[in-house]
Amino acid sequence: MIVRNDTLWMAQEAFTSGQAYDRAHWAAYTRHDYAVFNPVHTWIEYINRLLGALLGFPVLLATGWTLVRSKSHPKWALTMVAALLVLGFEAWLGKVVVDGNLIPHQITYHMAGAFALLGLLTAVYRSVSSEWELHALRAEREVEGLEADRRAAYPLFMGLIALLSVQIILGTQVREEVDALVKAFGLYADRSDWVAQLPVGLLVHRSFSLLILALSYYLYRKTAGLGGLKVRAAFVLYALLAETALGAAMYYFAIPRILQPVHLLLSAVSWFLLVDGAFKAWLMLRKG
């Protein structure tokens, strides 16, 4: 493979090259257009793969530990085995996405897998930590309406998880459209008219956030007096408020590049808090 005129060319067959370039021996390489070396992209991809590899070690160790304790805690073992399989799938799909130069739809699948992995690991974390909280949950004082609020909190957390899952998929599809514009016009192109070129899914994504915010505020009010759930509901509300504010900033200020990863990070934080809160609410119902 060679670079000529800022374009990658691939040899069509084995041959001995001479001093002069013979176009007949070469075909344009179309899988991606990284003919010009970009150190920023290279470092981001390197760190991404390094972190993915480092994540595999604790997941593998945790899976082994839960398998040893599978007789006493079979659900831990099953959940960690599922997490290990999802992690392996994510590693493979991540390579496919990169090799295919950000293939549309596969980014959405990759993102969905990442959030599924986060949900599984959060469930195990909450289940393990609940062993330490068991006595505190049993000692919690019963007050008027507390049991009813406990029962209401769990479906609210689950409902928000379902809505946020849909919102994340919608957002990932919007991101794919932005990637297409980046590919067409360049990373550093003027983005002032990009929002107008995005499909109607952006408007659905924007409006859907208001429903999620309203439900998260209702959850916050409903968990009053429930200790740890109140704190988690508050963090969920604050994270979703910040995420929505960043989304609005991207909409009205021409999709600043720096805001895109922060917006995604906040969605992951919100997802973690919701799964953690839902699992804790379920444990409170079971053990309270």
Q: Language model features by range: what are they?
A:
Residues I2-F57, P199-H205:
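Individual transmembrane alpha-helix segments
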Residues Q167-I212, Y217-R221:
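Membrane-interfacial catalytic/cofactor-binding modules of polytopic membrane enzymes
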Residues L55-L60, A114-W132, S209-Y218, S267-W282:
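Hydrophobic cores of alpha-helical transmembrane segments in multi-pass inner/ER membrane proteins
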Residues S130-Y154, L285-G288:
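Membrane-interfacial, low-structure loops and terminal tails that flank and connect transmembrane helices
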Residues H73-A83, A153-F157, L226-A239:
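Membrane-interfacial loop-to-transmembrane alpha-helix junctions, especially the N-terminal start
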Residues F37, G88-M111, V174-K183, T244-A268:
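Interfacial helix-loop-helix junctions of multi-pass membrane proteins
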Residues R191-R206, A254-D276:
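Membrane-interface transmembrane-helix boundary segments in multi-pass integral membrane proteins
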Residues L85-L87, A152-R175:
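Alpha-helical transmembrane segments of multi-pass integral membrane proteins
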